[in-house]
């Protein structure tokens, strides 16, 4: 007896129809070889719909009727990616005026790969770089159970219901080698023909058309009503396996692609391939660039990957991108337009960026009205002026920039000039004997552009430090533009993560002078928010076009009690978000301060090296310059920030307002990075090699006191230390090192963390029963440990939860210790 014979007739027919319709859909969408007429497919589809409507309990998880969508959702749930969805580094091959490509960046990529493989000869797979939306598909026992967007690479949104409406995504995998679990990464996009049809419908219905297929695909996939998504005709192409259990385990990426096709996925047939060397790769890239207009989908380049998965593993990753792959972008699309004006934008750090205001022009799929001119040197080099006809490019197909001026089209004017009498005298126009045409010359209508001397926002002087390309407004937090941008950064998710306080609210608070400094955020109360809202509403009502309505957004919701306006929950949510963010991790707090050159990674390094805010505030510049990934320029910027009385006062004000950055164990002891031979070489105004610095240290009795007082030390050292500022610096260094924990103390942790955690490398895999991944990571890092994304021989512990995959298998193979969540907590206590 087969499976169907054991069922009742209705269940049997539902199974038969589901299998039939899925097979027919595969033939139509993937093989492009339908075996039945459309009318017959529609008849069978309607039969299945009727059976499922009358017997919903018999509906199968891979039923093709799910592709029509369902009732709207209230919102999208978050999905934590088991394996982060990383980005790729970009490489460009600019063309000269004869259309010849300069492939220097790709040859450099090939050389880096070869160096990483110790001279090995890699094969490469080249695929189209689709201009769509990256998603991840999770299948268990062959059935699609979850689909998620990329999000920030770590956390995305659950779009399973919408993805099930995409016709060429199999709801159940095909073939004989179906894995127990597989997570497929790929791109959702909209074909050019479907995009044109969608925009025609939008126009006919009086709705705004989409700017490009990518925007249409992204907007369609994130519809809360999956029935709308179903109408939009999205398409999917797979490009990688994130994790897999069972099934056919490939050894090469080209085998993965073939496996995708066997499982029922569509591939961009004819537009990908495997090549033996970089020369063949580049020839195929140029072929694809020529073929680009004919393709049924938008691409903005190709993706080049090392074919061997073992070689991919050997090469590994750098930062947030793999070393074994690169996005080889096509030359950006360009267009001509006219510069109508040039003004400046003021950034968070006071950076003054000249911006060209342009006649609207369609470039690279979007309408461009502004383009960056980068800085004064670039404006002068390109000689961009108001009225010029310019070539505009979307650099990297993202940021519009002015490439060059078409000087032949520059607007000119005739101006009178003095005329020589031939013997060295100048005649004025009244007595000139030459024709009038010779008494004038054609000169540009507009003068060369120069940055203003003062900030257009706060009228502070614009200054440019020697050696710096960027000019900056000197107003600091006195400048409204810098205040707003600084506060937006301070409250952002990666900084203080103040939930509920968005850019529009901060801009309103600053514009109305209700908030001037970081600490002012912690003094906000209901009356302040109410005043902000009322002023925003007043501005909205006075705006003829109604554009200001979005400024207050959800702030416009009010309840009325006893005839008096009362703020609704939005205000209380903002206050709750401010209150809950008062105890940030030290690294987040340092990043939030907006110190120039200090990003997330540098902030984390500072936290790991010093453990407390007070130590960071007092860290001498030579010590800072010794830290990993922190050079002289960054160290000087950090030291300068904390040397300013107003910045120290600002931090004190935050602490007084109740902000309390969390101290953490020192996982990067000073002895590991700031040996005396290193910080001595970084003393300002004293040039010495590390070998001579070590000798000087030994002559001084291996103590800072000796450096301060020993009169037998070399004359050049005694001359240096005799200066008052250097005497003070040595005293500061002595005090600082005395307060830092020793290497043994650091290993134990500043608050008693034992050696099993501090300095150890952990890898998290699977779903933990209590903690989210980022919570567990925060606990480990606060205890002085490090969290890595991949398992290697250097891994100390793997913490495994439910559905732990290949990382657990690799840990067992390498003999790495595996912990449960409970065992991790025991280790941390």
Curated annotation (Swiss-Prot):
An example of a Gene Ontology cellular component annotation for this protein is: cytosol
Q: Name one Pfam family in it.
A: Nlig-Ia
UniProt-listed SMART domains: BRCT, LIGANc
Note the superkingdom of the native organism.
Bacteria
Q: What is its EC number?
A: 6.5.1.2
* Domain BRCT span(s) in chain numbering: 752-829
Residues annotated as binding Zn(2+) are 455, 458, 473, 479
GO-annotated molecular function:
DNA ligase (NAD+) activity; metal ion binding
Residues that coordinate or bind NAD(+): 38-42, 87-88, 127, 150, 187, 305, 329
Catalyses: NAD(+) + (deoxyribonucleotide)n-3'-hydroxyl + 5'-phospho-(deoxyribonucleotide)m = (deoxyribonucleotide)n+m + AMP + beta-nicotinamide D-nucleotide
The family database entries (PROSITE patterns) matched by this protein are listed as: BRCT, DNA_LIGASE_N1, DNA_LIGASE_N2
Query: Catalytic center at which residues?
Result: 129 (n6-amp-lysine intermediate)
* Assigned protein family: Belongs to the NAD-dependent DNA ligase family. LigA subfamily.
Give a short account of what the protein does.
DNA ligase that catalyzes the formation of phosphodiester linkages between 5'-phosphoryl and 3'-hydroxyl groups in double-stranded DNA using NAD as a coenzyme and as the energy source for the reaction. It is essential for DNA replication and repair of damaged DNA.
Report the protein name in the record: DNA ligase
Instruction: Give the organism, scientific name.
Output: Neisseria gonorrhoeae (strain ATCC 700825 / FA 1090)
Q: Which gene encodes it?
A: ligA
């Amino acid at each position: 007896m087969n499976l169907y014979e054991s069922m009742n007739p209705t269940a049997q027919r539902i199974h038969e129809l589901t299998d039939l319709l899925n097979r027919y859909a595969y033939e139509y969408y993937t093989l492009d070889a339908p075996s039945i007429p459309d009318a017959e497919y529609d008849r069978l589809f309607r039969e299945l719909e009727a059976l499922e409507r009358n017997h919903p309990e018999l509906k199968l998880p891979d039923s093709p009727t799910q592709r029509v969508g369902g009732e709207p959702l209230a919102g999208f749930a978050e999905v934590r990616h088991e394996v982060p969805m990383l980005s790729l580094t970009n490489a460009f091959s600019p063309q000269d005026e004869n259309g010849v490509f300069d492939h220097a960046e790709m040859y450099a990529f090939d050389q880096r790969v070869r160096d990483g493989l110790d001279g090995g000869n890699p094969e490469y797979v080249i695929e189209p770089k689709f201009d769509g939306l990256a998603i991840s598909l999770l299948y268990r026992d062959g059935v699609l159970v979850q689909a998620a967007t990329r999000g920030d690479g770590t956390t995305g949104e659950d779009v399973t219901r919408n993805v099930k409406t995409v016709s060429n995504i199999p709801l159940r995998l095909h073939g004989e080698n179906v894995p127990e679990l597989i997570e497929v990464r790929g791109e959702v996009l909209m074909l050019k023909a479907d995009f044109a049809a969608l925009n025609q419908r939008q126009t006919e219905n009086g709705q705004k058309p989409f700017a490009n297929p990518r925007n249409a695909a992204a907007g369609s996939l994130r519809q809360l009503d999956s029935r709308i998504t179903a109408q939009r005709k999205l398409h999917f192409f797979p490009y990688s396996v994130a994790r897999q259990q069972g099934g056919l385990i490939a050894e090469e990426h080209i085998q993965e692609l073939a496996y995708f096709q066997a499982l029922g996925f569509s591939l961009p047939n004819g537009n990908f391939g495997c090549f033996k060397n970089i020369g063949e790769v580049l020839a195929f890239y140029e072929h694809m660039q020529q073929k680009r207009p004919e393709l049924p989908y938008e691409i903005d380049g190709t993706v080049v990957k090392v074919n061997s998965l073992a070689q991919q593993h050997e090469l590994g990753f750098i930062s947030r991108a793999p070393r074994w792959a690169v996005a080889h972008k096509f030359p950006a699309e360009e267009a001509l337009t006219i510069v109508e004006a040039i003004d400046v934008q003021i950034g968070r750090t006071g950076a003054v960026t000249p911006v060209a205001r342009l006649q609207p022009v369609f470039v690279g799929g979007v309408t461009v009205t502004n383009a960056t001119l980068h800085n004064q040197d670039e404006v002068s080099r390109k000689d961009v002026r108001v009225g010029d006809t310019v070539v505009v490019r979307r650099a990297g197909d993202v940021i519009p920039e002015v490439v060059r001026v078409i000087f032949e089209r520059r607007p000119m004017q005739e101006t009178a000039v003095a005329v020589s009498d031939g013997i060295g005298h100048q005649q004025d126009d009244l007595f000139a004997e030459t024709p009038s045409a010779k008494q004038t010359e054609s000169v540009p209508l507009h003068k060369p552009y120069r940055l203003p001397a003062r900030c257009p926002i706060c009228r502070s002087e614009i200054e440019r430090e020697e050696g710096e390309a960027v000019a900056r407004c000197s107003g600091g937090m006195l400048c409204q533009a810098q205040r707003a941008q600084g506060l937006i950064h301070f409250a952002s998710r990666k900084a203080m993560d103040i939930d509920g306080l968005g850019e529009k609210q901060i801009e309103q608070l600053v514009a109305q002078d209700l908030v001037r400094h970081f600490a002012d955020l912690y003094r906000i109360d209901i009356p302040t928010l109410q005043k902000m809202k009322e002023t925003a509403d007043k501005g909205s009502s006075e705006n003829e076009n109604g554009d200001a309505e979005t400024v207050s957004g959800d702030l416009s919701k009010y309840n009325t009690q006893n005839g008096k306006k009362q703020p609704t929950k939005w205000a209380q949510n903002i206050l709750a978000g401010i209150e809950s963010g008062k105890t940030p991790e030290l690294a987040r707090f340092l990043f939030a301060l907006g110190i120039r050159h200090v990003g997330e990674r540098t902030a984390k390094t500072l936290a790991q090296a010093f453990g407390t805010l007070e130590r960071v505030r007092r860290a001498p510049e030579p010590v800072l310059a010794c830290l990993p990934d922190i050079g002289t320029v960054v160290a000087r910027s950090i030291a300068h920030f904390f040397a300013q009385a107003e910045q120290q006062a600002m931090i004190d004000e935050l602490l007084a307002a109740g902000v309390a950055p969390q101290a953490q164990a020192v996982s990067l002891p000073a002895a590991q990075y700031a040996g005396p031979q290193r910080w001595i070489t970084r003393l300002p105004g004293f040039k010495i090699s590390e070998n001579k610095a070590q000798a000087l240290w030994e002559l001084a009795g291996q103590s800072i006191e000796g450096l301060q007082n020993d009169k037998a030390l070399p004359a050049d050292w005694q001359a240096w230390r005799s200066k008052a500022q250097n005497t003070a610096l040595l005293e500061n260094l002595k005090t600082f090192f005395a307060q830092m924990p020793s290497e043994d103390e650091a290993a134990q942790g500043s608050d008693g963390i034992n050696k099993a955690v501090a300095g150890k490398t952990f890898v998290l895999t699977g779903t933990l029963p209590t903690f989210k991944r980022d919570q567990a990571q925060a606990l480990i890092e606060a205890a002085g440990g490090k969290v890595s994304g991949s398992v290697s021989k250097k891994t100390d512990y793997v913490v495994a939860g439910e559905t732990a995959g290949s990382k657990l298998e690799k840990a067992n193979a390498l003999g790495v210790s595996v912990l449960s969540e409970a065992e991790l907590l025991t280790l941390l206590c």
